[in-house]
């Protein structure tokens, strides 16, 4: 291993937690690398590019697309090395205390510390388990909502009852011709305010009910009817629809930690068990964002930023024990003086 190949911090995951980790790591003058499985940075926010995000402190409501743009710009401030289309498959602890990260392309990445910021895992939506469903994915069977305009004045059925399903139903209800929601349980499990909004809207909900069949139109290329089955009564009904949206969550990929030789404590067979300082059970390995679990964890994008800052601070002290516990705030940091002057000049034009 060449010393040039050894990074201070390697961040696995390029979503909000990973991008802020990269920014703050650069702020603390550490050589940083981001490894992301997807072909672009941004993480799960790519699933809802037109959704309005309200809960990032100091930001007015912003679309997912715009937030990604700003996060990426900030994350690349200190020019971290970015590796895309790459899956880290295992982490090994070397005799000298550094880490080797083995990727799916056969390459190895070397780092003094690691921050795992993989969120809810590699984005792989749970597909509808109906024979032949995949052929409609090119027409009107959707697992994400990338454009609200696509659904304007259409009759839509959404399968699912969690936060994503409820949020999309609320977003689409004002612009669609009709919105139906079908859920296998007796009540929706999304956030209380959003559930109340949906139940008080024109959307129609079917409980204890699932989509059991997709019926194509004369062209055989798109779904024209869905068959619904009530699991309590056995009643079968059919709905004429234009679009089907499936929100059944995402499959969790836990192979990274399963394949690693590290004794990382796990909660619920997926999450990294940590503490409020983003430390895991392995020295030098930290977690940030949705993958981290501990008592008092804040499950918001804003919480991911705090996780990231804590992880970077601990990584800095792991590498340099006499380093300060926290980085200097940006308003007084010499690193930003030149950048601030340039920004002020632009503002004065």
Curated annotation (Swiss-Prot):
The keyword Glycosyltransferase does not apply. It catalyses: 2 reduced [2Fe-2S]-[ferredoxin] + NADP(+) + H(+) = 2 oxidized [2Fe-2S]-[ferredoxin] + NADPH. Keywords: FAD, Flavoprotein, NADP, Oxidoreductase. FAD binds at residues 36, 44, 48, 88, 123, 290, 331. It comes from the Bacteria. Its cofactor is FAD. Pfam families: Pyr_redox_2. Binds 1 FAD per subunit. Belongs to the ferredoxin--NADP reductase type 2 family. Homodimer. This is Ferredoxin--NADP reductase 1.
């Amino acid at each position: 291993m060449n010393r040039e190949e050894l990074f201070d911090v390697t961040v696995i995951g390029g979503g909000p937690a990973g991008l802020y980790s990269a920014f703050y790591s650069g702020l603390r003058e550490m050589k940083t690398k981001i490894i992301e499985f997807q072909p672009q940075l941004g993480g799960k926010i790519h699933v809802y590019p037109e959704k309005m995000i309200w809960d990032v402190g100091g930001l007015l409501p912003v679309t997912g697309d715009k937030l990604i743009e700003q996060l990426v710009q900030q994350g690349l401030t200190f020019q971290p090395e970015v590796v895309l289309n790459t899956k880290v498959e295992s982490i090994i602890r070397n005799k000298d205390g550094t880490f080797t990260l083995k990727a799916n392309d056969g390459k190895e990445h070397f780092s003094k510390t690691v921050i795992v910021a993989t969120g809810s895992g590699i984005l792989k939506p749970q597909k509808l388990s109906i024979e032949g469903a995949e052929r409609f994915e090119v027409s009107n069977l959707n697992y994400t909502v990338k454009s609200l305009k696509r659904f304007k004045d259409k009759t839509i059925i959404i399968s699912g009852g969690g936060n994503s399903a409820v949020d999309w139903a609320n977003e689409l209800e004002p612009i669609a011709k009709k919105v139906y929601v079908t859920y296998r349980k007796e009540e929706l499990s999304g956030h209380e305010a959003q559930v109340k909004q949906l139940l008080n809207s024109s959307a129609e909900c079917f409980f204890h009910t699932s989509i059991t069949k997709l019926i194509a139109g004369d062209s055989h290329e798109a779904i024209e009817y869905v068959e619904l089955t009530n699991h309590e009564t056995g009643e079968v009904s059919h709905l004429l629809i234009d679009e089907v949206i499936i929100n059944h969550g995402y499959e969790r990929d836990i192979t990274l930690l399963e394949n690693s030789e590290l004794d990382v404590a796990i909660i619920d067979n997926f999450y990294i068990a940590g503490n409020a300082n983003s430390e895991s059970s392995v020295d030098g390995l930290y977690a940030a964002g949705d993958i981290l679990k501990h008592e008092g964890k804040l499950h918001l994008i804003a919480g991911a930023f705090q996780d990231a800052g804590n992880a970077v601070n601990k990584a800095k002290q792991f590498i340099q024990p006499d380093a300060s516990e926290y980085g200097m705030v940006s308003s007084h940091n010499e690193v930003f003086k030149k950048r601030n002057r340039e920004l002020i000049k632009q503002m004065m034009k």
